[in-house]
Amino acid sequence: MSKLSDKAAFQKELTDLEDLYREATGKEMAKFYRPPQGTYSEENLKMAKELGYKTVFWSLAYVDWNNDAQPSREQAFAKLLPRTHNGAVILLHSTSRTNAEILDELLTKWKDMGYRFETLEELFSDK
């Protein structure tokens, strides 16, 4: 997406995703944009904003996306737990076998560490 400079093409990428989301869930997709791979251009950010999207970056990620080289449970915890911080936006890829296996325990550990979880809608709402 970072190479898309044509607003119509950029918008089509997002509206196609919105359509797929609606088809899969029966709901409208929240207007948040995470630049794939964290790669973006100033033009992308401007177009996303003009289309009503809030751009959100992650503050913590690890190499969980490679299905042929999944981290072990121990490696995942060693990467994630010490790097977690207040306000963290943590990127966990849904295609990761390791993430699926450790998610319940990971969330429990974070709760035990005093963290709470909110949706992006909750984080950006006027409280």
Where are each of the predicted segments found?
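C-terminal domain-boundary segment and adjacent tail
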Residues: 98-127
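Active-site-proximal beta-strand/loop segments in catalytic clefts of secreted hydrolases
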Residues: 34-38, 58-61, 92-96, 120-123
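Alpha-helical scaffold elements lining the catalytic groove of polysaccharide deacetylases
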Residues: 1-25, 39-86, 99-101, 105
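Conserved, mostly hydrophobic/aromatic
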Residues: 33-36, 48, 55, 90, ...
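A short coil-to-beta-strand element that immediately follows conserved catalytic motifs
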Residues: 27-32
